[in-house]
Amino acid sequence: MSRKSIVQIRRSEVKRKRSSTASSTSEGKTLHKNTHTSSKRQRTLTEFNIPTSSNLPVRSSSYSFSRFSCSTSNKNTEPVIINDDDHNSICLEDTAKVEITIDTDEEELVSLHDNEVSAIENRTEDRIVTELEEQVNVKVSTEVIQCPICLENLSHLELYERETHCDTCIGSDPSNMGTPKKNIRSFISNPSSPAKTKRDIATSKKPTRVKLVLPSFKIIKFNNGHEIVVDGFNYKASETISQYFLSHFHSDHYIGLKKSWNNPDENPIKKTLYCSKITAILVNLKFKIPMDEIQILPMNKRFWITDTISVVTLDANHCPGAIIMLFQEFLANSYDKPIRQILHTGDFRSNAKMIETIQKWLAETANETIDQVYLDTTYMTMGYNFPSQHSVCETVADFTLRLIKHGKNKTFGDSQRNLFHFQRKKTLTTHRYRVLFLVGTYTIGKEKLAIKICEFLKTKLFVMPNSVKFSMMLTVLQNNENQNDMWDESLLTSNLHESSVHLVPIRVLKSQETIEAYLKSLKELETDYVKDIEDVVGFIPTGWSHNFGLKYQKKNDDDENEMSGNTEYCLELMKNDRDNDDENGFEISSILRQYKKYNKFQVFNVPYSEHSSFNDLVKFGCKLKCSEVIPTVNLNNLWKVRYMTNWFQCWENVRKTRAAK
């Protein structure tokens, strides 16, 4: 009988194994073993030729999404929060109707027929690898939906799976962001050769990663031929560029920076790092780079990097120490009017005050046109709109004050008592704080929300002592140069009884178990501290708040009609523009409806973002005169680049229309 695949076996060919028979006698029941012998026996699955995953053909599917019209006013629209917790799942009340059309390839379902089995068996791994490589190299005709944090392709995932992925990204170690996972291989020894010992594997050298050449959008060029690099440390060192600028201290921007970054064996010329004071101290703290290799740029002042080129650094409204840089080139011995102006935003959250400050510096040199703008295009997709930072901070702080004043039951309309109520001692509390507020944060960033809560509650900010975060926060508070945020080191404390607001890593708020683990760590600092707490409330600043249904855009082949519609959108947005940037305010009701009655700890997602929303970018591009806009994010998708370029052209049309009036 020839060997067959399991899909070729007929039911009639499967024989059951005979079971033991029992015979009974008049004297009692006696079990007798079956003496029947047969040449046939039951087969196990391992005896059949079952196709494995490596033999199966690889299929793909394409997704297309309907485009939705967007209203320029989001005043009456509640922000929908896509969990970043780690960018847990919450009940969303959304009434918008979303139409999603999924076009599945006919070859998506794999059907195995008798005449195909042999063909599948003959396919080798080399052939499959070749097919995969071909598929990777083929340009995808559908839009690639990426995670804004690690830029991984999420197109093949369902919506809830995309949310879960972003939860993992936000809660993971920032140093791992944007780096591919290592392939895990099983090493099987060859029977003809002895297996490698552990010592041999340990002593084997890892291959050296070949650094890529600096991409063009990382290099800024001036008329006199001078060149500088911005946020480009993970590439092959240039033989002619010695000035490197770091916009802020986030891992996706300083990646590649290390203590030996100026090693003469690797670098043809000695380099200098330019950054803000806070960023310089953090770089020195983390990488031990000598301060004599770092040039601190003063805030809101002109600094000359050559005899004819200057840079003005302004607050980027991102994380502490983040800056936007206005480079201006002048003719020798003529500094009245610059011949070239370049603006690099780094990562930034645009607002009306920032735009006015840039326009003021441009007006001082009698040249209001920027030749090139290197723009942070993280949320450069229609629909990525969220409230201003000021609105979110004020609303969340007001909510905490209301919760302290009225209590959880009255605030949420819940008569059920918290478990902490029964655990708490009946004696007077050892400190005056009944509710513990946990605010999620990155290595650096999101501190504004926690500090605003401290101001409302008149309490200090607690950070775990002897931690890297404590050292960083102390550095930020001691060297704060932002005139809008009057912070000082007296705000920070490591005494549990001086604070009811704790700054914690976002991963602490991922689940009830991780919060329990954090409270356990507090018990190690002081045994009786947790017993006096009645409630624990956490806030996850997500930034992923937008009108549902506008997240994904359908590709439109009619560029002319699309351009016309986009221009109208920009004109309408500018017509209804307000100076206070709070037309899309955040309301307490958005927090209250996330309440989970049966959860021991309440965790709320709030749409606090340190990146510019889509509408922020539109206002920025329509108000500033610029000849060319160069995106710095979402450049790995050709359609996305064209999509952004169309919007840049619309901004130019709007500027011309407004100037003609």
From Swiss-Prot:
Q: Provide a GO CC annotation, any one.
A: mitochondrial matrix
Q: What is its EC number?
A: 3.1.-.-
According to the UniProt record, where is the region Disordered?
1-44
Q: Which InterPro entries match?
A: DRMBL (IPR011084), Rad18_UBZ4 (IPR006642), RibonucZ/Hydroxyglut_hydro (IPR036866)
Induction info: Expression is increased by ultraviolet light and agents which induce DNA cross-links such as nitrogen mustard and psoralen.
Q: List zinc finger spans: UBZ4-type.
A: 144-174
- Signal peptide from the UniProt entry: none
Question: GO molecular function, one example?
Answer: damaged DNA binding
Q: Which GO terms describe its biological process?
A: DNA repair; double-strand break repair via nonhomologous end joining; interstrand cross-link repair
Q: Where in the cell is it found?
A: Nucleus
The alphabetical list of record keywords is: DNA damage, DNA repair, Exonuclease, Hydrolase, Magnesium, Metal-binding, Nuclease, Nucleus, Zinc, Zinc-finger
Residue positions annotated to bind Zn(2+) are 147, 150, 165, 169
Q: Where is the composition biased (Basic residues)?
A: 31-43
Other facts noted in the record for this chain: Present with 259 molecules/cell in log phase SD medium.
The family classification in the record reads: Belongs to the DNA repair metallo-beta-lactamase (DRMBL) family.
Protein purpose: Required for DNA interstrand cross-link repair. This requires cleavage of cross-linked DNA to generate DNA double strand breaks (DSBs). This protein has 5' exonuclease activity on single-stranded and double-stranded DNA, which appears to be necessary for the processing of DNA double strand breaks prior to ligation.
Q: What is this protein called?
A: DNA cross-link repair protein PSO2/SNM1
